[in-house]
């Protein structure tokens, strides 16, 4: 580790938070209907869209209607994408004549992108046509991000309103997420990436003569537009199999910094948006400070262990130096380490290095971040997970002092706790049970690229990534088999929608309650003292749940290294 590397990581995170602060206020004003500068341009466009789809923007929905609209729209979009993948061989914009995607793989891919996971059991440049990349992949990267954002807005309305069943209008939230946030920022990011060397073309693969005198086919396509929403929407699915390690997706250190800031911008801003909704900017500062500190700690741990290198090489061969296996030298260790931490903290899943090549305890950092699933988290759903653990922390704190738990003036009763507990427990359930099944099946074990503890970590990482809707992988695992295509697809769906359903039900319950006046005995949630309790709760829950599996994986592997 070097001082310049440590400082570089800190400055990138600081710049990210500085950009997220004003964006959080803008998101709040947009979704509560206050006047904002883009109104003059966007309001007529949005009205035209509402007329086209037959929606009255003035009519709000209760939590059941909101959820119904969300689930139906997501089902239709997933079926559309599945059809595109299955029919791409006969559809236009396929200059490489790529055949149709097999049914199991098409199911996995559709489930992956509708859930904002972007797990890829295929190589994008070899398995998808340009049309599939644009109207299948890129389309879902926008709509899945907008869906998560809409769910977060509905939950914040439930916390901030009283004596009502209205949580907003899903269609209005979905449209605004596109017109006011995702499309404008993605366009700016795409132009910046273009200027820095990321290609954007509908021309077919380029065939070139190499210096060695042979012919080489170089894949290309509409990369910049996909890359922008891939990061901004915390999607992570790459145009190329190498993802953001590919020079066409991430040519240099400047694009690497842009992509890190792109993936973290809106999730960080949503913490400040929550502060505006709940009239508690101090709470937003407390949460952002603590979660940011955990993000930095994770990045520094990765940096430290990768900089220390592999002790086996040092002891056996006398080779000292950092572990550069699976890394791009154009980024260096500091940006690589921050990317590893950020892509799992924000549940993006893009990679600029091969996580399978990380040192064991370095690889445990992204695993832990996905197991916690709330170090900022993904677009919208990450905020839901933060607020879910906030409710659980308030409940535990209330029990310790003998008071009825309440949060933001609303009593937390049995219904809310049952739903929050269900949302909390589904995450480890859909990680640990499929992992155990996979390790019990010889056909599933045959997909492991490595034996022993590292092979187990590959399987654990795959299901953790799917459950957290992250999408990154220990790429030594061959996931393109019927078992993994189906099981990982189902885990992604359960990991995404069960928690959303539970949290919207909580929002509907809290919205109907009257706000209780604050007294001297009211638990203050906007203090660092409570913030430490909040952090302790999710760390203890994570440690108790996942430690045995981590001991069989990265911890055991580190002990083997000596």
Curated annotation (Swiss-Prot):
**Principal cellular location given in the protein's record:** membrane
Q: Which Pfam families is this protein grouped with? A: KdpA
Q: Which UniProt keywords apply?
A: Cell membrane, Ion transport, Membrane, Potassium, Potassium transport, Transmembrane, Transmembrane helix, Transport
The terms describing its cellular component in GO are: plasma membrane
Which family does the record assign?
Belongs to the KdpA family.
Q: What does this protein do?
A: Part of the high-affinity ATP-driven potassium transport (or Kdp) system, which catalyzes the hydrolysis of ATP coupled with the electrogenic transport of potassium into the cytoplasm. This subunit binds the extracellular potassium ions and delivers the ions to the membrane domain of KdpB through an intramembrane tunnel.
Name this polypeptide is given: Potassium-transporting ATPase potassium-binding subunit
State the organism named in the record: Alicyclobacillus acidocaldarius subsp. acidocaldarius (strain ATCC 27009 / DSM 446 / BCRC 14685 / JCM 5260 / KCTC 1825 / NBRC 15652 / NCIMB 11725 / NRRL B-14509 / 104-IA)
What's the gene? kdpA
